[in-house]
Amino acid sequence: MLFRSRFVFAFGCNDIGSTTQDPMLIRWSDQEDAGMWTPSATNQAGSIRLSHGSEIVTAIQTRQEILTFTDSSVYSLQYLGPPYVWGSQLVGDNISIVGENAAAIASGVVYWMGKDKFYKYDGRTQTLRCDLRQYVFNDINADQYQQVYAGSNEGFNEVWWFYCSASSLENDRYVIYNYVEDIWYYGTIGRTAWLDSGTLSNPIGATYANTIVNHEYEIG
């Protein structure tokens, strides 16, 4: 991961002098030098090991921090400057995330799918009230959690999650949270990836047929 302040991060990596991968270790390069990973008094390369959980699952950038998910907790990584450079703070414990693509950021807030509920982080970790909780989690293929894909649709104040229903090996359903109106809706569609509009005219989604599809697109 490349952070905005021009550090490169490696999650779940080997320590210096070791070839053994540590699933809870985070390392970062020197600022402005992606090739320098050995800490010294003259650079800002370094590392930190998280303590809650057994492996790092994923991480997502916000404006001020890197939200990092282990298999049982959530950490906030923030830039402190020398000599510590980066520090970690536990912001949620006994909290799950189903896969590395199950979190998305919308309007500065991070939303994600856990193994039995949905969450958000806006400076503090909260459980989302979800009218569709039983509909989603009673009919989801837990063996295919890694296929879950979250994406924002900020033009409509939405966060989408694409997932496999219990009898499917491919994403065939979606659930949407409208964070302004605080309502949920659902449907059936297969998407493997998602990119919000940003500089594009419309958000786009990828399919299992290796095609890119425009969404929120009016014809005529």
Regions found by a protein language model. Name each.
Residues 26, 37, 56-57:
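A broad "ordered helical/assembly scaffold" signature
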